[in-house]
């Protein structure tokens, strides 16, 4: 029986459409939790937090989870300086705190986590990260080509090696170079799910609040429920996962 986590990138403030109410409706229909990762960026730290505070936080059930997603770019240029990234992580935590949210789950936008982030994330209380994309290479950005496919604690000097970090990394389910996302074609998503149902203990599925993955979310939830899967939040998985 696989354990499933579904995490949503929340960055709809400047996208023109937000599918959060519909995604929540499906989650309630099947009584499955989701982890909502609200995006903060250097250029626009507030828009998504303000959107969720005004429109959606009161609609998301208390048994779901609210976490943090950071976009490490400034004017289209990746931020690679460790200290600057650490300040942005701290800013994200402080902004969510103003909404009475203490995030313990995290994702780096565009899968651009770097090793210097580990200590900063641990220092603000993050226990689990959902950035890793095994087997996927983002040219000129990151290479997750030989990353582990199941949850692991990384080394402090190598994100793709198992080590002593407190932070648990939960890789997104991938197969054939594609990441499991609710807004992809159903046939492709089904292929990824089927592969991991055969081979994995944990299946991590991603979503984007500005992309219409509602129908696939309904199919996915039913499909996995019928196969005996249990659904948890990212932080719940971290609390259950042994070293």
Give residue spans per PLM region.
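Metal-dependent polysaccharide deacetylase catalytic core of the NodB/CE4 family, i.e.
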Residues: 33-116, 132, 136-138, 174-176, ...
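Short, well-ordered alpha-helical microsegments
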Residues: 16, 114-118, 213-217
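Structural preference for beta-strand elements that scaffold enzyme active sites
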Residues: 3-7, 33-35, 65-67, 103-105, ...
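C-terminal domain-boundary segment and adjacent tail
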Residues: 35, 44, 189-243
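Short, surface-exposed basic-aromatic patches at helix termini and helix-loop junctions that form
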Residues: 25, 57-59, 115-127, 222-226
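Active-site beta->alpha N-cap acidic-glycine motif
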Residues: 1-59, 223, 230
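Active-site-adjacent pocket scaffolds in enzyme catalytic domains
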Residues: 108-199
